[in-house]
Design a protein with these regions (language model features):
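Terminal low-complexity tails and localization/encapsulation signals of metabolic enzymes
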Residues: 1-35, 67, 71, 121-146, ...
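Glycine-rich loop-to-alpha-helix module at the N-terminal edge of alpha/beta enzyme cores
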Residues: 23, 28-119, 130
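Conserved small-residue-rich beta-alpha loop and adjacent elements
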Residues: 122-196
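A structured beta-alpha segment of the ubiquitous adenosine-cofactor-binding alpha/beta core
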Residues: 132-133, 200-219
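Short beta->alpha connector loops at strand-helix junctions that form conserved
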Residues: 168, 173-175, 203, 224, ...
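Active-site pre-lysine segment of PLP-dependent enzymes
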Residues: 182-191, 206-215, 228-239, 255-259
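ALDH superfamily catalytic-core signature
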Residues: 228-281
Length: 282
């Protein structure tokens, strides 16, 4: 099965026509799907679509944006088992853990949908006569979201849903290793009623990532991944004064003291090393 990019409400191949294979790591003979192998021109079109959609999406009342996201949470909840099984097939976590990954996306989407009615500003007394001082919350614009393979539905939800409920638009670049989970997530948003161009999906490598972090029409960059790539993202975005969020790789030390419960401590060590295929930073 071929899965294209999602740009301006349409599922389309990459401009180059190239594809990426996604295979089951536990059975490399099992081809999960073929995905668009995108170039900078694909990312350019996605950013343009997001910029255009922003002009109308930002004007949709926040409670109405939230209603769309609430519907998305309901759809994911109904299809949780399907999404979890596909996630296990494409990236290797055991089914119990991929169910948890999908559940995080459900919980985050429900929680952030409620923020549609909590985007409060502030009022303050003014030192000037006949003046009224207040602050309001406003969206920032186009947001680039670059996500890793280890939590392929939870992490996109953490980034995309807050951006959408606040009136921003999004271009998502998932890991090339786990694009199917992101395709599922974006299709859910499409089904829930997110307008064309508000969410865009581009699967690809460094050329896509570079444009998403340097393009002048991108206001926010949110990246989760390795420290080396995170440094590069920051270097790319800094000259343009973009707002940048980085969550980078970490190795958590475990110190076992003399009075520790050894059985409990060893259980923690083993879980930390092998739980969630050893890719949880806890």
């Amino acid at each position: 099965t071929f899965f294209g990019n999602f740009i301006s409400g349409q599922w389309v191949p990459s401009d180059s026509g190239a594809t990426l294979e996604n295979r089951n790591p536990a059975n490399t003979g099992d081809l999960v799907g073929l995905f668009a192998d995108s170039t900078a021109s694909d990312a350019e079109r996605a950013i343009a679509a997001a910029k255009h959609a922003y002009q109308s999406w930002r004007l949709v009342p926040a409670p109405k944006r939230a209603e769309v996201l609430f519907r998305a949470a309901q759809i994911i909840e109904k299809r949780k088992e399907e999404f979890a099984r596909d996630m296990t097939r494409e990236m290797g976590k055991v089914l119990d853990e991929t169910r948890g990954d999908v559940q995080e996306a459900i919980d985050m989407t429900y929680f952030l949908a409620a923020e549609g009615r909590r985007q409060h500003g502030q009022t303050a007394p003014s030192e000037l006569r006949d003046k009224f001082a207040m602050s309001i919350r406003q969206p920032l614009g186009v947001c680039s979201m670059i996500t890793p393979w280890n939590f392929p539905m939870a992490i996109p939800s953490w980034k995309i849903i807050p951006a959408l409920v606040c009136g921003n638009t999004v271009v998502l670049k998932p890991s090339e290793l786990t694009p199917l989970s992101s395709v599922h997530f974006v299709k859910v948003l499409e089904e829930a009623g997110v307008p064309p161009g508000v969410v865009n999906l581009v699967v690809g490598g460094p050329a896509v990532g570079e444009l998403l972090t340097t393009h002048p029409d991108v206001s926010v960059v949110s990246f989760t991944g390795s420290t080396a790539v995170g440094k590069l993202v920051n270097q790319n975005a800094a000259p343009h004064f973009k707002k940048v969020h980085l969550e980078m790789g970490g190795k958590n030390a475990i110190m076992i003291m003399d009075d520790a419960n050894l059985e409990l401590a060893l259980e923690g060590c083993v879980w930390g090393g092998f739980g969630k295929i050893g890719r949880a930073h806890v």
